From Swiss-Prot:
Source species, domain of life: Eukaryota
Keyword DNA damage: no
Keywords, comma-separated and alphabetical: Membrane, Transmembrane, Transmembrane helix
Organism annotation: Saccharomyces cerevisiae (strain ATCC 204508 / S288c)
Extracellular side: 92-231, 279-380
Keyword 4Fe-4S: no
One GO term describing the cellular component: membrane
Main localization (coarse): membrane
Membrane-side (Cytoplasmic) residue stretches: 1-70, 253-257
Protein's name according to its UniProt entry: Protein COS12
């Protein structure tokens, strides 16, 4: 498509006739995601068909008058409901897949970036477009900006990143490749601006990190640090411990070696479970902005050769995550070694090997900055 023709096409988008301020995101209308999801399902054609199916079955039950018949039919109908509920998610993806071009146009027009709030305008406009053109039965297709951003990453960003050299063969409908590439270009440009803003001298505040103590300084050992983290983050551990201690004080027969051994085994399994999954939990607690900030600390922290680089990075990240109220404890990393291992496993390894790991491999937009952080580490 000619460049001038493409720009003219983008300039007159059909969705511009909708005033985004006249539409409201579902997150501001419904009490929760669950109520919105139920509303969407109840207004679907599949659910209404399921309700109509009950009428002949109830009539047949009245004629037969057998109780076991009603039980069998009820169980069967709920199986059908489960199937229709699952199919609704597939139908939603198909609807979005058919409107990839319009979705890309909204991204080009509104230029969203890495912030979730930037995607709310895209969600509002796209919801209105689908409803006004009778492509969706409600005006609440996207729940919020986060769900809209996630759909973009799944429908456009991921296929592009996995098939970068042959994007035309990715799961993108014919005729929409031009809009899709332009939308991705807009998105990457906004992320690049965010990266430069984070790295600017005005944003990188120089906090005093000497007062921030690691586990071996503040708690005596990493074991005590791990125990404290488990108590704070794992509610099951705290609940079980309090419940057993209460029972131990009020019920004398629990004070025997068998019960104590059992409780110790349960508590130990909880600690081991948490310690195994602590890195994954730490990674999932970070959104894209937090990860970008972490990479910025690494890139700027390795500008000069210093044996305490990772310790300073860990302290700054601990302070940042605690101030952002992302981590309940002021200690996210126990020391510099812990911080370095976290970076290598969840950031460096997926990019270097391009492996399909369960976490870390889906943040495709962060790959250039991960490589920049790797380069900074290797230059030391």
């Amino acid at each position: 498509m000619d460049g001038a023709k493409f720009e003219n096409t983008v300039a007159f988008l059909p969705s511009e006739i909708f005033d985004c301020y006249n539409s409201t995101l579902p997150k501001n209308v419904f009490r929760s995601f669950v109520t919105w999801s139920c509303y969407e399902k109840f207004n679907s054609l599949e659910f209404r068909t399921w309700l109509l199916m009950w009428l002949p079955l109830i009539i047949a039950w009245k004629i037969r008058g057998k109780r076991h018949y009603l039980v069998i039919v009820t169980a069967l109908m709920f199986e059908v409901l489960y199937f229709l509920w699952t199919y609704s998610y597939i139908f939603r993806e198909r609807t979005l897949g058919k409107q990839v071009s319009q979705f890309a146009k909204e991204i080009i027009t509104n230029t969203p970036g890495i912030d979730t709030e930037d995607w709310e305008r895209v969600a509002v406009n796209f919801n209105s477009y689908l409803y006004e053109n009778k492509l969706w039965n409600t005006e609440y297709f996207f729940f919020d900006g986060s769900s809209c951003q996630e759909a973009f990453r799944k429908m456009l960003l991921e296929p592009f990143s996995l098939k970068k050299n042959d994007f035309a063969n990715a799961k993108v409908p014919d005729g929409s490749v031009c809009y899709t590439e332009k939308a991705l270009q807009v998105y990457f440009t906004q992320i690049e601006r965010k990266w430069h803003w984070i790295n600017s001298e005005g944003f990188l505040h120089n906090k005093t990190t000497q007062s921030v103590q690691f586990s071996k300084h503040g708690y005596g050992s990493k074991l005590l640090w791990a125990f404290k983290e488990v108590t704070i983050m794992n509610s099951r551990f705290a609940f079980f411990s309090i419940a057993y201690l209460n029972g131990l004080l009020t019920i004398p027969r629990l004070r025997n070696s068998l019960h104590i051994l059992y409780v110790c085994a349960v508590l130990s399994s909880m600690i081991i479970e948490y310690l195994i999954g602590i890195d994954k939990f730490r990674f999932k607690s970070m959104n894209l902005i937090h990860k970008l900030q972490f990479l910025s600390y690494i890139t700027c922290g390795h500008e000069k050769s210093d044996a305490t680089n990772w310790s300073q990075i860990a302290k700054r990240t601990n302070t940042y995550m605690f101030e952002q109220k992302i981590w309940n404890s002021p200690i996210l990393f126990s020391d510099g070694i812990d911080c370095e291992k976290f970076f290598k496993w969840y950031f460096s390894t997926p990019v270097s090997s391009q492996a399909s790991l369960s976490v870390g491999s889906t943040d495709f937009e962060l790959w250039p900055y991960i490589k920049e952080a790797q380069s900074a580490c290797n230059d030391v």
